[in-house]
Amino acid sequence: MPSQFFGLNIAYTGLLASNAAMNTTSNNIANVQTEGYSRQQVTQQASNALRVFQTYGCAGAGVETLAIERIRDEFYDGRFWDNNAQLGEYDMKQYYMQQLETYFDDDGKSTGFKTIFDQLMVTGMQALLKDPNSATAKSQFVGYAGALTEYFNGMAGNLEKVQKDINQEIKLKVDEINSIAGEVATLNKQINTIELTGVKANELRDRRTLLIDELSKIVDVQVKETPIIDANNENRETGANRYMVKIAGGQMLVDGSDYNGLECVARTSYE
């Protein structure tokens, strides 16, 4: 028969489990506005029962808290990253297409290619055809031709500026990708260090997922996490995981605590 203190111990385990649940709930409420925070839940199970060799069998031994885990769906994370990559791509295209639209704007009255071209080929040419010897018509035609030349030169300058802006944007994005990759690799090492002890590094995992969210705005990402098996026992997981991030059709960006930096290389040919 268990002692009277055994009942007190059962109550004590209940207090500990309830305290863990209350602390987790408080943490969830406190971080309701925290970007990237994942709601956490407490996993509990009944403690191993005590055999008391009585007719009723075993006596319950209370409750124990197994873990505090994030509530996160990897499937929806993957779908979000896929859609986020498309959103980032089209946002960037829209931004530069709107710039190009301003350069090609044509109101048909005073500005734009059609207006300038019509002045040359309709107004100027018709006047010259009517009176080929007219100095005024010739001068007017040359003036319209000069205006069209200036339009093309100005357009070329504007397009070159857009091209330089895009190249600079690419360089900045590459630097941002490298920065994120370095942070993810560092977090991978920190997470494994903690989780090797059997504790879930929930906050660090949230930070890592938030970085992948940012990365997915720039480039397509594929994330895979697999448990690391004990080298001496293939049936035992160590608690650590191999976290891999691939981009651009399967190129490895981050593999555990290592990452491969990207580099911008100028194109030498336009063929």
Residue ranges and their predicted role:
Residues 2-13, 19-82, 86, 92, ...:
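Phosphate-proximal small/polar/acidic motifs at interfaces that engage nucleotide phosphates
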